[in-house]
A protein has these predicted regions:
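Residues in well-ordered beta-strands of folded domains
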Residues: 24, 41, 72, 108, ...
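Short amphipathic alpha-helices in soluble, non-transmembrane regions
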Residues: 84-92, 147-148
């Protein structure tokens, strides 16, 4: 299972340090902080990559996976919004890449920065944002008791990692 809280804490702390503004989850029931702030939505919590589970030992299996995050900067002034959105984009595309990798997150793709204003907010708030695709590892604990040592299929016995034997 992916550690959603660790990934969230890593990204939120990195963005907060980079931008110097509060970073919150979008669509929160809590009161919003004063402008400027950055918000995020996890658009895709888990998509296993094309591949198979790999047994890495110590009771752990893993498979490469992806998450997609939507990052939005909210400010009163357009120029502040543009600068903060570009800083956030740079965090995912360059300045934070090694730090994120050291915390188990690989950046696979950073989208273009686009306006995210709405008609309701256009007079008093500016929004710019982008999507970022994260490469992560989905892990699962296993027990040796869970291993199928052999199977019979159409009179053929499959065992020892896939060897077919007549018995």
């Amino acid at each position: 299972m992916i550690d959603v809280d660790k990934i969230r804490q890593t990204i939120v702390c990195g963005l907060k340090d980079t931008l110097g503004v509060p970073v919150i989850r979008s669509n929160t029931p809590r009161a919003l902080p004063k402008l400027p702030f950055c918000s995020y939505t996890i658009q895709s919590l888990l998509k296993n990559s094309e591949g198979t589970w790999q047994r890495i030992g110590n009771g752990i299996d893993r498979i490469p996976a992806r998450q997609v995050w939507s990052i939005t900067v909210n400010t009163e002034k357009y120029i502040t919004c543009a600068k903060l959105a570009l800083l956030a984009h740079d965090f995912f595309s360059k300045s934070g890449v090694i730090w994120l990798k050291d915390n188990g997150i690989v950046i696979e793709k950073v989208g273009e920065v686009t306006p995210r204003d709405t008609l309701i907010t256009v007079d008093y708030e500016h929004r710019q944002g982008f999507d970022v695709q994260l490469g992560i590892m989905n892990t699962q604990e296993y027990s040796e008791d869970d291993v199928i040592e052999s199977a019979e299929i159409d009179g053929q016995y499959i065992k020892d990692g896939g060897n077919i034997n007549d018995e």
